[in-house]
Structures are given as C-alpha cells and as structure tokens.
C-alpha cells in the first residue's frame, strides 16, 4: 500500500483554517466581508472576551436560500466566481469559498439566515466541522452568524492568542477600517454592554472621518480631493505615438488606457505617529497592507518628516479590477499591482502636490534691535519649562520635606527675555580673505618656537568616567541650544533639551515609585474624543495614567474628561501627550511589558516638559542643569536613546592644533 493518502475533509479544513483564521479578528474580517458582499446596509458586531468566547455578526443583507446555506460550508463553494476568467476581474471582497468551512472547523458555529425568496429561514449548527443540526426557523431577512469557543479544538493555536484587550483592539481596528471604506453603511461594534463604535450612514467621507475620529483629528487632516491619472496601454504591435493619434481621431468605445483615481485624507508633516497603525489603505473598497503604497506615501513626505515617523493617512484607490491581483494570500490583504511603478509615482506625486498646496504661507516679522522697557519681562514662547519650575518651587515651599532626596536644589529659574536674540550664524556667506601680514618679529618667533611642542607628560589621561560631569564649568551656549562646558579633561558640548529630559525622566520615575507625583488641577476639565482602538487602550492603562499624575474618567461614549495632569506638563501639551501615551500603549500591547509602558509614559512627560532648543539660559541655570545631570543614573543618553553630550579631550584638542 502506498504512503501517500488523501487527507479527510476535517483535517484539511483545520489546515486551511491555519491560514484563513489566525486570530479572532480574522473571523470578524471574513464574516464582515461576506455581509458587505451580501448588500448589507447595517452591520452589527458583538464580541466577548476579545472574541475567544463569542463573535456574532448581524446584517440585513439578502440572506441565503436553504440549499445555498448548506453548500456554503463545503470547501471552495462560492457564488462569486464561475470560471478562471473571473479571477482577473474580482469585484467582491470574498471569493475563495474558504472562510465558512475554515471557521466552522475550529469553533462552534451557528448560522441563521433567510432569503426574502423563501417564507422561512434556515438554522444550521456546526461544531468542529461536524454538522449537528439543520432546521427551518422563523427568521427575519438577513444573516446572523454566531461563533463560540474559537480554537476550542486546537489548543496550540488558542495558547498563542494574545490578551483580551489586544485581540479586542485588533477587532476594533478592523471594524473601523471597513466603516471608513463604506460611509453609506451603518456599523456597530460592542463588547458586553459597552459600545466601542457606532456610526450611521453619511453622505461624505469627511462626515465619516468625523464620526470615527472626532473633530480634533479631522482638523489636523488635509483632504486630497479627487486625483486622477490615465495609463495609456497601446496594442503591442502599434507604436505608442501612432496609437495615441488613432485614439484621438477615432475615439473608440473601449479606450486603450486605464484610469487610476485617488481620494482620501492625510496629515500635515508636523503631525507624526510612531508606527503605521494610523495609515489606512483601500483598493476598490478592499482593506490592504501593501509595501508599494506605503513606500509611495513615505516618499511623498521625504525631507518633510523624520524617517522614523509616520503620517496619519486615509487613502482610497480606485482602478480597473484587472490592474490588481487580490488572489495572492488567503487573507486577501496582500495584493499585487500590474503596473506598480506607475501607481507608485501617481500616489507619491498626488500627495506631494497636495502637501505643497496646503502648506501655510510664511510670515515674517522684524526683529527689534532692543527690547523696550515694557517688554523686558515678556515670557519666551516656550514657557512650559518656567511653568514647570514655578510649579516645582511652589510645591517645594509647601512641602516640609524635599520631593526627592539626594537631588541638587533647583535654582530660582524664571526664563524671561532680557535682550534681543543673538543673530544666528550664517554659513552660506562667502569666506573672508585676509591679506597676509608682515612676518612675525624675532621675539614672537622665539615664543612660537618655545611653545610649538606641548610636553606629553603635562597632558592628563582622558577621564571618561561619568563623575567628570560634576566638575564641568559652563562657558556659554551655541545657538541657545547647546551648552559649552570645560572640564578637567577638555571640552564638553551638552544638548540642553535632552539633558533636561533625562533629569525630569528620573525625577518622574522616582516620584511615581514613591507615590508622590505632583499634579495640577485644570480650571475646566478637558474633554477628549477617542477612537474605538484608543478607548480600548485607555481602559487598559487608566490605572497607569492615574499613577503617573493624570486624573481622567469616562465621559460619555468614546470620550474622556481630564481633570488633572502632572505639574510638569503644560496645558498646551496635555492633549498631545495623552494621545501620544495612547499610541505608546498600542505599541506596548504587543510585548505585554508593563514596565516598558510605565517608562515610556514617564519619558513622554519628560520630553514635553523639558526645555527646548533656541532657549537662552544664564550661567546659573546652566550650572544647575550640569549638576543635576551628573546626579542622574544615566547621564549620557536621554530616555529615547539619543546622546546627551559630546566630549573632546585635551589630547584631541592639542592634536588637532598640531601641538602633539
């Protein structure tokens, strides 16, 4: 007897389910696409325990006949394809006929459906790929699919599922994607009694963006409008110039070109995200993740945004179905474009042109030669540093004991503009040629000869220990951004922003560990509107926010009220830092590291509260900054890994001047 045998259908379905059903969000995706293909105008998604215990999809589509409902659980049974030619022009979201049998093989599935062509509906129950019952039922029009105990018979796959909030966030992201792609339909997502997303049909994409993300995000976006570009496709046997001339003269019914159409929204360069989770890409209404489109988007922001940052973007591409191959992977999120190079340039150019059109016109104001007496006390634009210092001074005066023991006392900081800003150096000016002077006198020559060589024994050995920072003596600033300091061995250049960021980071960490984070109450609560994913992240990290000095509470559907914040955070930065922390929480959900989340929250607070570049400091402030930096545990890098100081030893300086 031969060794090769055909696998039973139950085993084959479980193998296929490994590609189609990766996690609960995969089940929601397949069933949601079936609902949209069925012409549903209202889709409701209900989940429990992150989709492990329950996933229910309810739609008002045209439903299925009894025979179709039974046949739908057979492998590769579909109503969307007839022959191989149909693969070249797929217009539906689903087409492979693998979703229902794959889902039914790894769960307990209940299908309830009724077509308006039949007087009664059909109820089918399947567990682990085995049909338990099939009966008639009194049902309304549409389809309800209930999936329970996902992966109950595949323990290995169930073991590798993430936490419930993580799986729920993936489901929320998926439903959010499809609600954006179909603004003319109603979507609802709920987990238990909590509704995470609820949108009604609207007339425009702009209204749907407002429903999903709120006015705060919408105000930061730029609408692309309608961008179109035609790709001319002459017959292979006809030269392009001749084909164009024939087309213009005859205007055939089937023109030899393909039209690409791009609409959507994108953020301005100053709105930066730390990951690609805020990039939504759709092709003919289908959610995709494509490297070609992502590269075109990043190319549009070239030199406008750091390479490590990503924009917020909603891109909707429409093209001929023959221009895109969606039959690449069972998940159908990976596609291939027939003319990828043309599409890449079209997307890049469209976004780049719109970016240039939407940029604000520059304004110039004359720089006063001297500050009038009435403006001597005008506060600098970057006032969060002085505000933070004033808060710390006030809190320190009210407390009987110091906030953190062992830290250097903070001086009386009050950053005020006392003189006009120092003109920036202009390196674009041509060099000044200096005419050669008379040769040095004999006396000067003898002095040069005598000091031309520096004795090596007089050069101290380089001391790279961190204790050398405590002996630094500030000399001044470069561009009011970098502190120049002299030490026992050479010269130091310190980035004042990242140095202060390191100091505040360790202060916030220690205050948080001691349970004594200084907070300030807001005069009026700040109301923030969250997306469905952000609402899940907020519920997961609400306790961490409270421990870090933020007093927040739910305030209606997908909104929170902020009543207090850490004293180091200025009111103007509060909204941005909270959204930044929620974005950090979304990233940390993949690692499930609570300690990393806490450190990243403290790092965000420190970064926003630290002094900025282009801020003048007097010597007293510089001295305090250097002393406080030397007292930190890691004074050579900021919490995000950037270097704080550069060191040029005496030996390196002498060697550069050819003294040794």
Swiss-Prot record:
Q: Which InterPro entries match?
A: DNA_mismatch_repair_CS (IPR014762), DNA_mismatch_repair_MutL (IPR020667), DNA_mismatch_S5_2-like (IPR013507), HATPase_C_sf (IPR036890), MutL/Mlh/PMS (IPR002099), MutL/Mlh/Pms-like (IPR038973), MutL_C (IPR014790), MutL_C_dimsub (IPR042120)
Q: Which CDD domains match?
A: HATPase_MutL-MLH-PMS-like, MutL_Trans
Return the GO cellular component terms, semicolon-separated. mismatch repair complex
What Pfam family is a match for this entry?
Answer: DNA_mis_repair
Matching entries from PROSITE patterns are given as:
DNA_MISMATCH_REPAIR_1
| Superkingdom field | Bacteria
The stretch of residues making up the signal peptide is none
For this UniProt record, give its keywords in alphabetical order, as a comma-separated list. Answer: DNA damage, DNA repair
Biological process annotations from GO: mismatch repair
GO MF entries: ATP binding; ATP hydrolysis activity; ATP-dependent DNA damage sensor activity; mismatched DNA binding
Q: Does the keyword DNA repair apply?
A: yes
**Biological function:** This protein is involved in the repair of mismatches in DNA. It is required for dam-dependent methyl-directed DNA mismatch repair. May act as a 'molecular matchmaker', a protein that promotes the formation of a stable complex between two or more DNA-binding proteins in an ATP-dependent manner without itself being part of a final effector complex.
The similarity annotation says: Belongs to the DNA mismatch repair MutL/HexB family.
In Swiss-Prot or TrEMBL terms, this protein is called DNA mismatch repair protein MutL
The species is Solibacter usitatus (strain Ellin6076)
Q: What is the lineage of its organism?
A: Bacteria, Pseudomonadati, Acidobacteriota, Terriglobia, Bryobacterales
- The gene behind this protein is mutL
């Amino acid at each position: 007897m031969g060794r090769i045998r055909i696998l039973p259908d139950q085993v084959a379905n479980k193998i296929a389910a490994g590609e189609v059903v990766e996690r609960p969000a995969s089940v929601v995706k397949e069933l949601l696409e079936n609902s949209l293909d069925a012409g549903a105008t209202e889709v409701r998604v209900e989940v429990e325990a992150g989709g492990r215990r329950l996933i229910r999809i309810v739609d008002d589509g045209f439903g299925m006949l009894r025979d179709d409902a039974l046949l739908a659980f057979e492998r590769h049974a579909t109503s969307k394809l007839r022959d191989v030619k149909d693969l070249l022009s797929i217009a539906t979201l689903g087409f492979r006929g693998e979703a229902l049998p794959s889902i039914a093989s790894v769960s307990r599935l209940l299908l309830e459906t009724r077509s308006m062509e039949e007087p009664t509906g059909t109820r089918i129950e399947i567990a682990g790929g085995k049909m338990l019952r099939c009966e008639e039922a009194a049902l309304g029009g549409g389809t309800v699919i209930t999936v329970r105990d996902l992966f109950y018979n595949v323990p290995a796959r169930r073991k590798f599922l993430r936490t419930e909030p993580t799986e729920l966030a993936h489901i929320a992201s998926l439903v959010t994607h499809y609600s954006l792609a179909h603004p003319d339909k109603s979507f609802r997502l709920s987990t238990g009694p909590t509704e995470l997303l609820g949108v009604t049909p609207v007339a425009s994409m702009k209204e749907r963006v407002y429903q999903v993300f709120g006015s705060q995000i919408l105000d930061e976006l730029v609408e692309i409008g309608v961008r179109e570009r035609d790709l001319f496709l002459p017959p292979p046997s006809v030269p392009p110039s001749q084909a164009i001339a024939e087309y213009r003269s005859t205007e055939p019914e089937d023109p030899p070109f393909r039209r690409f159409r791009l609409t959507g929204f994108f953020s301005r360069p100053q709105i930066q995200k730390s990951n690609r989770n805020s990039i939504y890409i759709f092709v003919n209404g289908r959610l995709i993740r494509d490297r070609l489109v992502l590269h075109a988007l990043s190319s549009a922001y070239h030199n406008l945004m750091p390479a490590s940052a990503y924009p917020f973007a909603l891109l909707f591409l429409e093209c001929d179905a023959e221009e895109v191959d969606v039959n690449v992977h069972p998940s159908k999120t990976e596609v291939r474009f027939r003319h990828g190079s043309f599409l890449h340039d079209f997307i890049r150019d469209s976004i780049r042109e719109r970016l240039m059109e939407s940029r604000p016109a520059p304004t110039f104001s004359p720089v006063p030669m001297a500050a009038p007496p009435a403006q001597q006390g005008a506060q600098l634009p970057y006032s969060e540093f002085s505000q933070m210092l004033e808060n710390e001074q006030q809190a320190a005066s009210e407390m009987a004991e110091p906030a953190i023991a062992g830290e250097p006392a903070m001086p009386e900081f009050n950053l005020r503009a006392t003189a006009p800003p120092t003109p920036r150096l202009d390196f674009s000016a041509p060099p000044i040629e200096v005419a050669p002077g008379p040769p040095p006198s004999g006396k000067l020559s003898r002095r040069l000869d005598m000091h031309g060589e520096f004795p090596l024994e007089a050069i101290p050995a380089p001391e790279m220990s961190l204790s050398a920072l405590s002996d630094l003596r500030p000399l001044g600033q470069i561009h009011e951004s970098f502190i120049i300091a002299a030490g026992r061995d050479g010269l130091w250049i310190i980035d004042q922003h990242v140095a202060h960021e390191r100091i505040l980071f360790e202060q916030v960490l220690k205050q948080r560990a001691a349970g004594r984070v200084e907070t300030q109450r807001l005069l009026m609560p700040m109301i923030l509107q969250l997306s469905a994913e952000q609402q899940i992240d907020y519920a997961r990290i609400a306790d961490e926010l409270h421990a870090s000095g933020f007093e927040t509470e739910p305030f209606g559907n997908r909104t929170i009220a902020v009543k207090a914040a850490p004293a180091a955070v200025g009111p103007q930065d509060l909204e941005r830092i909270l959204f930044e922390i929620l974005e950090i929480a979304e990233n940390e959900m993949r690692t499930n590291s609570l300690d990393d989340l806490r450190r990243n929250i403290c790092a965000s607070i420190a970064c926003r509260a630290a002094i900025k570049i282009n801020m003048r400091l007097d010597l007293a402030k510089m001295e305090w900054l250097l002393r406080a930096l030397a007292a930190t545990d890691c004074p050579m890098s900021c919490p995000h890994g950037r270097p704080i100081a550069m060191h040029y030893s005496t030996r390196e300086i002498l060697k550069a001047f050819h003294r040794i």
